[in-house]
């Protein structure tokens, strides 16, 4: 993909990739959340596991170092609602943006708090 969906996360004051805590039935869990959040039928969403990364990172929420297990999935939408064709859009009060990796790398706040994840996505999706 040449652009990725990110959203404004007020707690971090940063644009982040969509993210969810790992769940027992992780792929269904992710599809259900994306379906609900983006107002797309779950049968129009497919998901593919790409990679995993375990590392230590500073938690903005907890103000301490924590160990994270990041699992990367690529999501494909069979239908693409008109609202999502804009560079930015809002659904249920959440502001979303389509951004390229290079745009993320130029964003100082993303570099400060999430460069490791941008690099992880870049390594596995290019």
Where in this protein do the model-derived segments appear?
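A generic structural micro-environment signature
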Residues: 23-28, 46, 56, 60, ...
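Alpha-helical and coiled-coil interaction segments, frequently adjacent to or embedded
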Residues: 1, 5-6, 51-58, 67, ...
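A short coil-to-beta-strand element that immediately follows conserved catalytic motifs
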Residues: 41-53
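Glycine-rich loops and low-complexity Gly/Arg-rich segments
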Residues: 31-32, 40-43, 71-76, 99-101, ...
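Active-site-adjacent beta-strand/loop module that shapes the phosphate/pyrophosphate-binding cleft
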Residues: 53-86
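Conserved Nudix-box catalytic region and its N-terminal flanking loop in Nudix hydrolases
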Residues: 2-41
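Nudix hydrolase/Nudix homology domain
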Residues: 10-22, 66, 80-126
